[in-house]
């Protein structure tokens, strides 16, 4: 049986040439595939170097694996260093490793950001959980959870010129430079704006409640005095052009009487039941800075910017006595020690003491805080709080004088200061248009200071009281000492000596 042969034989010359061409094409294809494999191998090795892997050791002792690339004649440089040199190989390896390490580090940082942030968050959460056993963290958590002892800060857009607590309710009045009065209900958790009363066309310089809290009195740069009914929120009485000059201060004597003082040194006494002033006296030439009286309300005292303390007899409606002039502004005052002592603060930071009824010249002088004093309020019968341009509220013991420490702080000069009816809460406003509250109930536990007691004036002036937002450095070391003492007590035990 005849079988057809499909394979070509090399007997024919043309057929042999065709076979040789096919073999050449096959060999070329195999060489190209090997080159591609070697290129992929080199790329993988470069990626490993970029990721920080060490450079493979290509010393002459290493065995040939059949995948090493052959240098091209086109890249040959007769002036280049011998590639077989160990030194050049080490240098190349070091450069490649450092460059690859830096690049790979950056690449890992960029690529791992999302997952890295999650891992960091988880680590932080775990750290917080573990840190709850630490003394410092526990103290911080306790401070955060500790209930507030004073109302939060009140912030206004307008400059606050004066503040005043209501005698019976948890309400504070804030007078502003545009002539409005804001009434806030305060609480340790939050403050609530009750209403805003538009009372004056110019800056409201002083605001006071009557003793029974029924009426709100205000005086202004517009020379008027306004009386507002707290229940109806309506105007009760208007004393239009009460003074010929801008009114600077106002003082309530009782439920009916009040006094005012202006920028030109005029003092007037008013009765809410009448339309006109009871009397007026012009014994001074400069601004009346403050007016006050004692519980008997027989004498009305006035301090002025021209350095005089002037006393008026209310019943006789005339001046009682005027002090010797001082070369500084007398800015504020308070009555202490059972109405037996009058203390006056000055623009030079001094505190002058007068025996009651003897107002011609001071009987004692205390250098004070070495910073202008513009405000003073009695906290107890022997403790005063003073404030001024340095932004600090300081407590002072009266007769004998002692700096008790810093009650509170503002970032800017303090403009007004007041204490509530039970003497436990102080409010202060500053040039930053803010009102801050300070719980000073701890003053009830302060004992009386004797004249012969030793004290450190430098430390006292910088000491921070419990209401202050700053702590004392000594408190930190005191806590450390206490912890060390507790550790020593815990480590101590019965003796094992025979």
Swiss-Prot record:
Disulfide bonds: none
A biological process term (GO) from this entry: defense response to Gram-negative bacterium
Family annotation (PROSITE patterns): WD_REPEATS_1 (PS00678), WD_REPEATS_2 (PS50082), WD_REPEATS_REGION (PS50294)
Top-rank taxon: Eukaryota
InterPro entries (UniProt xref): WD40/YVTN_repeat-like_dom_sf, WD40_repeat_CS, WD40_repeat_dom_sf, WD40_rpt, WDR55_POC1
Record key words, sorted: Repeat, WD repeat
Stretches for region Disordered: 1-133
Ranges for the WD repeats: 155-194, 199-238, 242-280, 283-322, 325-364, 409-448
Biased composition regions of type Acidic residues, renumbered to the chain: 12-23, 31-48, 83-95
Similarity annotation: Belongs to the WD repeat WDR55 family.
PANTHER family: WD REPEAT-CONTAINING PROTEIN 55 (PTHR44019:SF20)
Protein name: WD repeat-containing protein 55 homolog
Species in which this protein is naturally found: Drosophila erecta
